[in-house]
């Protein structure tokens, strides 16, 4: 085949893959990253696991919604090496895998984070994921012991592992599990965001720490969202305010939004616009339309539905009935306004 023709075909194929990737929805992108991680774990390709993590530490490596791909890397890793109901054989196998990873690549940040992840997951398997009142008294001591082991491991290997911003997200989860006082948690958060100011997971795990059901209140969420917005305004505008409330809605407020929160909806709308200016992804559009419905903002919901793709994403809406209610409510208003 003529060399120029071959190059043309290869270029066209590359463009096709770019288009296909752009059209893939958010969950498909995240699942694809997780699948890559799973394949590398199963093939025991330690070098490739590290190379992928290094690649995803680049702030430019994001999904269509703007979320760092590094977060999906660690979610995928957790899905492979941990389980909520692991057998003894599974635990031993995965511990051996992580040990082998560390032996083969002792300076791997991701391998060290994986080891801490195993300890943390075992703690939660002992405790259970329910409310504190459902935990058996005899399970508290071993839960706290394994959480402390995870904290100590992270501290011991900080010089290796904190080249990865997820070290700080991991430590913030531990801080939440141990109920650190606000001052101590704030010091950790400021250290992490001082090194990695754009890593969303640091803001998201801090949001969970500040939820009313954990260590904070609705007011502490709003105060934090405003501080975070000011610190990231040069890159995000008001987008961080909106993203923090996104986590708060998913983690606690949900159908009690906005009544149970202290949100400034006008500011959150500005944040929606700022996120959409950089990441006009259908995942963002549908979530923001849903939040607009919860907030009772018909005009904002209608404008977002006008930009939405053809299919509702059930990861956003939970049910087709919920989507139809919101869509009908917003669209009918828009049609009436257009007719006047």
Predicted segments with their positions:
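Bacterial N-terminal signal peptides that target proteins for export
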Residues: 1-9
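Bacterial N-terminal signal peptides
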Residues: 8-17
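Sec/Tat signal peptide C-region and signal peptidase I cleavage site
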Residues: 20-24
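N-terminal mature-domain "stem" immediately C-terminal to a signal peptide or N-terminal signal-anchor/transmembrane
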Residues: 25-65
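Short coil/linker segments at helix-helix boundaries
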Residues: 47, 55-107, 117-235, 239-270, ...
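Intrinsically disordered, low-complexity segments enriched in Gly and acidic/Ser/Thr residues
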Residues: 251-300
């Amino acid at each position: 085949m003529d060399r120029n023709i071959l190059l043309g075909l290869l270029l066209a194929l590359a463009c096709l893959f770019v288009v296909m990737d752009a059209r893939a929805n958010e969950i498909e992108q995240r699942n694809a990253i997780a699948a890559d991680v799973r394949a590398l774990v199963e093939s025991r390709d330690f070098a490739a696991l590290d190379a992928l993590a290094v690649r995803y530490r680049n702030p430019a490596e994001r999904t269509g919604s703007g979320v760092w791909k590094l977060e999906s890397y660690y979610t995928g890793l957790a899905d492979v090496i941990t389980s909520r109901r692991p057998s003894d054989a599974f635990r031993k196998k995965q511990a051996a895998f992580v040990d082998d990873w560390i032996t083969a690549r002792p300076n791997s940040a991701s391998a060290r984070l994986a080891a801490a992840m195993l300890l943390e997951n075992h703690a939660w398997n002992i405790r259970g994921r329910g409310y504190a009142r459902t935990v058996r008294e005899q399970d508290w001591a071993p839960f706290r012991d394994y959480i402390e082991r995870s904290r100590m491991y992270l501290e011991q290997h900080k010089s290796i592992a904190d080249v990865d911003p997820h070290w700080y997200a991991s430590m913030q989860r531990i801080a939440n599990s141990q109920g650190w006082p606000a001052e101590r948690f704030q010091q950790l958060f400021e250290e992490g965001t001082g090194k990695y100011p754009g890593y969303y997971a640091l803001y998201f795990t801090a949001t969970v720490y500040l939820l009313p059901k954990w260590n904070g209140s609705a007011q502490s969420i709003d105060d934090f969202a405003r501080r975070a917005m000011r610190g990231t305004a040069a890159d995000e505008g008001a987008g961080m305010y909106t993203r923090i409330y996104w986590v708060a809605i998913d983690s606690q407020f949900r159908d009690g939004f906005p009544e149970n929160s202290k949100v400034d909806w006008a500011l959150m709308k500005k944040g929606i616009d700022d996120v959409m200016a950089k990441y006009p992804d259908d995942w963002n559009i549908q979530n923001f339309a849903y939040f607009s419905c919860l907030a009772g903002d018909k005009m904002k919901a209608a404008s977002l539905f006008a930009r939405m793709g053809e299919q509702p994403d059930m990861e956003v809406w939970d049910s087709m009935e919920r989507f139809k209610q919101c869509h009908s409510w917003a669209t009918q208003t828009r049609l009436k306004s257009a007719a006047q």
